[in-house]
Amino acid sequence: MSLSFCGNNISSYNIYHGVLQNPCFVDALNLVPHVFLLFITFPILFIGWGSQSSKVQIHHNTWLHFPGHNLRWILTFALLFVHVCEIAEGIVSDSQRASRHLHLFMPAVMGFVATTTSIVYYHNIETSNFPKLLLALFLYWVMAFITKTIKLVKYWQLGWGMSDLRFCITGVMVILNGLLMAVEINVIRVRRYVFFMNPQKVKPPEDLQDLGVRFLQPFVNLLSKATYWWMNTLIISAHRKPIDLKAIGKLPIAMRAVTNYVCLKEAYEEQKKKAADHPNRTPSIWLAMYRAFGRPILLSSTFRYLADLLGFAGPLCISGIVQRVNEPKNNTTRFSETLSSKEFLENAHVLAVLLFLALILQRTFLQASYYVTIETGINLRGALLAMIYNKILRLSTSNLSMGEMTLGQINNLVAIETNQLMWFLFLCPNLWAMPVQIIMGVILLYNLLGSSALVGAAVIVLLAPIQYFIATKLAEAQKSTLDYSTERLKKTNEILKGIKLLKLYAWEHIFCKSVEETRMKELSSLKTFALYTSLSIFMNAAIPIAAVLATFVTHAYASGNNLKPAEAFASLSLFHILVTPLFLLSTVVRFAVKAIISVQKLNEFLLSDEIGEDSWRTGEGTLPFESCKKHTGVQSKPINRKQPGRYHLDNYEQARRLRPAETEDVAIKVTNGYFSWGSGLATLSNIDIRIPTGQLTMIVGQVGCGKSSLLLAILGEMQTLEGKVYWNNVNESEPSFEATRSRSRYSVAYAAQKPWLLNATVEENITFGSSFNRQRYKAVTDACSLQPDIDLLPFGDQTEIGERGINLSGGQRQRICVARALYQNTNIVFLDDPFSALDIHLSDHLMQEGILKFLQDDKRTVVLVTHKLQYLTHADWIIAMKDGSVLREGTLKDIQTKDVELYEHWKTLMNRQDQELEKDMEADQTTLERKTLRRAMYSREAKAQMEDEDEEEEEEEDEDDNMSTVMRLRTKMPWKTCWWYLTSGGFFLLFLMIFSKLLKHSVIVAIDYWLATWTSEYSINDPGKADQTFYVAGFSILCGAGIFLCLVTSLTVEWMGLTAAKNLHHNLLNKIILGPIRFFDTTPLGLILNRFSADTNIIDQHIPPTLESLTRSTLLCLSAIGMISYATPVFLIALAPLGVAFYFIQKYFRVASKDLQELDDSTQLPLLCHFSETAEGLTTIRAFRHETRFKQRMLELTDTNNIAYLFLSAANRWLEVRTDYLGACIVLTASIASISGSSNSGLVGLGLLYALTITNYLNWVVRNLADLEVQMGAVKKVNSFLTMESENYEGTMDPSQVPEHWPQEGEIKIHDLCVRYENNLKPVLKHVKAYIKPGQKVGICGRTGSGKSSLSLAFFRMVDIFDGKIVIDGIDISKLPLHTLRSRLSIILQDPILFSGSIRFNLDPECKCTDDRLWEALEIAQLKNMVKSLPGGLDATVTEGGENFSVGQRQLFCLARAFVRKSSILIMDEATASIDMATENILQKVVMTAFADRTVVTIAHRVSSIMDAGLVLVFSEGILVECDTGPNLLQHKNGLFSTLVMTNK
């Protein structure tokens, strides 16, 4: 065919009747605007434009949008689509002519290029903010509009109309060019860049003036929005450097929690006003959410409708293409000047291109719908969290204290209910999109197959409710699993906390068995869960097969015609479309029900009682300054700062005379006060008190008399039934601690009775938002005796404490809370029983240095609630409480004069406290606390050191490697871990899973191939009605086999996952429980517990479905590629570049997704912790009036979590858009190849069907790969513990060789003993030699770290004995099996450990002893009467950790436990360190009598306790330096023992 612009006919070039009368020259005229634009713009684009000064200097170049920006992009895309149609129409028309007529499509091609150039040119001009250069575009649109109008008029003159496609295309282009011209005119009008002296200046949006904003979706152009092109930089950079919070920056203002909170709050307040007019109505949160977030949901729904409608283009185009391929080739070419729309759409190539464009648009709209709903859901969640937090800060204290609103309920609202509503919003568009999709699908099926299609639709509709039933059962099974999992974790936690005792008593197997029993119950529930999960997967796969089988079999026998390929494969595609919404229906309904329940809970919470607006909060109702100047009877005296630690009322007069004169003002006054906790009954009644300004007021009384309630009532935490609380104005001119300091008018510092700490550093807990002043900070820490404790912490006062940090003792926590109150720059300080958790030394120091010196010298008003009556001598004012009322108020002298009985009662109580003081002086609690903290720090430092060394090694390796190596490591899938997980499920199940999966997908491919053969056979060879029994039978058998294999594969995967989970947990538990004690010393408890909780949960419930989905989607994609290649081998040529593109997409996405997932997870915990710690410390926060600061912190944490989740969602959209576009390219390639190279219509239909399938599953392959990579991290963590070396439980002696009653005598010989904790550590005992006679009482002492406890551990082989030996009753303990050795000895540890269960279980977990023996042990331990008084006696309940017993009782239970064993050797490892003297005396007495004939080795906490021992061993730095009786050692005045005795006096 010859090539020419107007064809070979000479008349085509005739312009005799005028140029415009020649169609070819009119088409040539249309080239002029395009050539003009290309000629003008290309030099500007490639050479550069404008001066640099005209460009906006900002880090984001996408912010500037000229007027009509989005409209321009939409119109340009529409114009490009019309140009494609024009090109296609021209090519199809040209193909019907004898010679080539370039004018039919060449102008359209140039138009397409010019339009593309126009939008590129516009984008560059826009980002450079140089609008003057847009004049070229204005001229282009004017010229294009004119030329297209001339062409349209010419067609109209020829008599063409709406039935002619070319006329329609030209008309649409005239409209589009005209609209684009109008857009340019509007830009000129608004920006005033042409013919105006002062062009408009444009400022960047407020968001992008902040360099921290990195989320650019709202600011980029439409193309970048649709394709998430702006995400490329972040996702690609993840290979070089992990994505951190700095990389993702901050949220734009419109997406921040505070912005959405204001929006939702206004809508909710409007609903509250409407509800106020109707008493029985509550404000509707649903309507509030609709008002606030309805618009984006409607936009998302519109996108969804468009996507769903475009989704039906696939089946229709498949039908059209297969029909065209099936038609016999007609060699006679019918010439026509123009094509109709019907003729145009009958062209197979046109249909292929339209299918490609429809897929692109469908997937773009679908991802846009997903993004808008996710963004709206995130915004809703942020707003709800802010609303909940705002309510928490105003929540009535009685709601929390009286149990109406628990901390768990608040945490559920935050962690569960808000997420339920967010997920419901994600699924919302499905509610109204699904009915349209189902109706459209059924109508199209009916048009294709007639009434037989209704049979298949009926099968789907009837079977779909089963999915809802399965989903309900899944939820029940999950709840049951959670309950068992909680119980298992509780037991595991107990094991880990008491692991030292379990090992020493050789009880590991008993407790391990208990955990295994609970695990079996959990696994039973997991089996149910796995079964229903398998059924759900089975239903998803089997229902489409069943529907297709029913439809085609019905059609084969009920219809009068054979099944054609076009009908068959279009129907298959429609069935896949129809099944999806019906399956989603159950999920949407389930989430809708959950959302309704969540809204009910949220509404109840938001309508719950709030705290009253008291005068001290609002600044109103204050007591006039003048009326406060009433004499309070207080006489001023100086303080004796060097007063001893005992206080007597007899010294009162002397103490009072020493206090300087102070102001007589009243700081707080309560008149006729009646206060309640919300029940309506007054907890405090008839309260008339006054608190003098600048003085120390003490509130005293019996436990439960209302002292703490009085403080809280003054703070406004209680409900005021009657009366008033007045707060005095503050005299700002008073001298203060700092000359430059100014105090808040109603500022209060408050230390609660129950210490409350933030999850923050020690410094942040003390300063509590106030500016840091080093001098003041040091004074406070010294006053609270905190510096020695801070010095023990690994990072000093920068160490994080609280839930996520170091666990401090009660006393240490209490002192930090008191330090916080002291540090604050407030006029008034409330201290609620600050001495309760402190020993006498600390209490005395805090009273002297903290309260009397630091606070009183600063003339601050101090209100102190205390039981320590010995401090009453320092009180300026005393309030005595009894049964919720004020018993007495006044100075101590007033009370002594007016109420002698009360005064004498106080003196009696003080004498008792003095007696207890003598005992407490010996039982130094602070020393014990610091020792415990030191041990914890040692363990953490050791672990941290190991981790630091590992990190340093990794860093060195990373530095040595080049960038490509780092990228390779970041992108590498953990295949080794995957294989290890798969083999944990058993090789048989692994083989069965692989085999069944391959067989199932082979059968599914066979079903489709059989259908292709069936339809092709009868459509070609026998167009009439034929006997189809053979094909129907074969099709039915294959479908039945496919359904059966769907069930087998789903069950196999779940069962393999369950088996792997069972084996991994079993191995982990046994490895941990048999691990060396050193492992538990150096590994934080939370880290080990995390393996049994979060990691085990991932292995149990998350990996199996991910693995199933990954294998299914991968095999579907591979089978699709295989079938397409089989149908059209030419496709393989295009497969290579598509495969390369897919490889790089998944490679970059997996790394970025993993980082963003970790960021999302890591930012959730601080947010949840902030909510829980706010609820716990509500009274303190409100007392300090720090609500605003805490709100701001909550908003920051919410935004941080939201930005991480938003980026993760955007990354998922980035992936799905690209894989969807790749899928569309595969469809286009397959279509073109099928049309050009295949004459078998069945295979063409099959190839196109599988090509459409790929678009659905490509992104799932990558998503599942990314998820599996993250989840395999849990397996890797578990595996890291499984490689740990266990203790060597075997010995050279067989257990049967050990005498039954060994050790019977209790003789111990220590020969040159050397001990260390690990091979790479220094010895802790060096060449120790000692001999202990049978039945001898031995005392071991030494300074901290001298090796005392190490020796006790050596008896049980808990440490590495690398030299020397210990011989007990003639047997070297190194030869004994560990279980035998440990089961024959007894030990009582410093920390008394009891386990949850019964008293019987704690004494005899092996159930070997009779009740008489147990009662005998309890009687010896002085516990028999107490246990008898308990309900159940020996079977009485022991709570976790034995918390329902005192520390002393717990230690006595441990003694009884040791006696039950009746070992001839008892070791007491500082067993009396944590108990008082009275309990210690009982313990020593019992040991001397009950163990009179046994060997007792006592490691002394107090040297005085071993003075009467038959032998005393004194250690120093791991060496035995002294060995003799106590009296003999005391004779050596310079000896270590003598020094220790003198020190402890």
Curated annotation (Swiss-Prot):
GO biological process: action potential; ATP metabolic process; blood circulation; blood vessel development; blood vessel diameter maintenance; cardiac conduction; cardiac muscle cell contraction; cellular respiration
Keyword line: ATP-binding, Glycoprotein, Membrane, Nucleotide-binding, Receptor, Repeat, Transmembrane, Transmembrane helix, Transport
Protein localization: Membrane
Residue stretches making up the ABC transporter domain: 668-908, 1308-1542
Membrane topology (Cytoplasmic): 52-72, 123-132, 189-301, 369-420, 474-528, 590-986, 1052-1123, 1263-1545
Any GO molecular function: potassium channel activator activity
Topology with respect to the bilayer: Multi-pass membrane protein
Glycosylation (residues): N9, N330, N331
Residues binding ATP 1: G701, Q702, V703, G704, C705, G706, K707, S708
Pfam families in the cross-refs: ABC_membrane (PF00664), ABC_tran (PF00005)
Domain of life: Eukaryota
SMART domains, per database record: AAA
GO cellular component annotations of the record: acrosomal vesicle; cytoplasm; inward rectifying potassium channel; membrane; mitochondrion; plasma membrane; protein-containing complex; sarcolemma
Predominant subcellular localization, coarse grouping: membrane
Stretches of the chain found on the membrane's Extracellular side: 1-30, 94-101, 154-167, 323-347, 442-452, 550-568, 1008-1030, 1145-1241
Region ranges (Disordered): 940-963
Keyword Ubl conjugation: no
PROSITE patterns on file: ABC_TM1F, ABC_TRANSPORTER_1, ABC_TRANSPORTER_2
Acidic residues bias locations: 947-962
Subunit relationships: Interacts with KCNJ11. Interacts with KCNJ8.
Function: Subunit of ATP-sensitive potassium channels (KATP). Can form cardiac and smooth muscle-type KATP channels with KCNJ11. KCNJ11 forms the channel pore while ABCC9 is required for activation and regulation. Can form a sulfonylurea-sensitive but ATP-insensitive potassium channel with KCNJ8.
Family, similarity comment: Belongs to the ABC transporter superfamily. ABCC family. Conjugate transporter (TC 3.A.1.208) subfamily.
Protein name: ATP-binding cassette sub-family C member 9
Organism: Rattus norvegicus
